[in-house]
A protein has these predicted regions:
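Juxta-kinase regulatory segment immediately upstream of eukaryotic protein kinase catalytic domains
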Residues: 1-36
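N-terminal/domain-start segments enriched in small and hydrophobic, helix-friendly residues
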Residues: 14-16, 49, 73
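ATP-binding glycine-rich phosphate-binding loop
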Residues: 27-53
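Short acidic/glycine-enriched loop/turn segments that link adjacent beta-strands
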Residues: 41-44, 100-104
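Conserved hydrophobic/aromatic beta-strand scaffold that supports enzyme active sites
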Residues: 47-49, 59, 105-107
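Conserved hydrophobic "DFG−1" position in protein kinase catalytic cores
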Residues: 49-52, 62, 96, 110
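A conserved alpha-helical element in kinase catalytic cores
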Residues: 57-101, 117-126
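Conserved short submotifs of the Hanks-type protein kinase catalytic core
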Residues: 101-114
Length: 127
């Protein structure tokens, strides 16, 4: 299995359709001024931390429906699961979902953290 941090071949934010980028910025409440792409993962969809002019941030995933219908399904399912988690759990909350220019996007709260990396960490989060 390839290393998690080097596995994803993701499109850049600037490569996404302008209408999609505009719709995401509208949902975020202002223009996106900085992007920190997610280097890890195993999908071909966009994923990154977007910072807006007002200083807020959101983690956004996006996929082209025609090219990656399975990712659209996965992201929509993730949004549905996030909506059903009990209040008070230390998890990011869904901020928005949208369809624009043949793409589906999911935005969630930006949280500090990283994926568990060692066997001990994986065991701890599994229990």
């Amino acid at each position: 299995m390839p290393p998690y941090a080097a596995a994803a071949g993701r499109p850049a934010w600037s490569a996404l359709p302008a209408a999609l980028r505009g719709a995401v910025a509208e949902r975020l409440g202002g223009p996106v001024v900085a992007v920190r792409p997610a280097a890890g993962g195993f999908t071909r969809g966009f994923a990154g931390l977007l910072h807006t002019a007002d200083g807020s941030a959101s983690f956004v995933k996006a996929a082209a429906a025609a090219e990656h219908p399975h990712l659209v399904e996965w992201y929509a399912r993730e949004a549905a699961i996030l909506d059903r988690l009990p209040v008070g759990l230390p998890v990011p909350r869904r901020r928005f979902t949208l369809h624009a220019s043949g793409w589906y996007a999911l935005g969630v709260d930006a949280i500090a953290g990283r994926p568990p990396a060692s066997r001990d960490e994986l065991t701890a989060v599994a229990h």
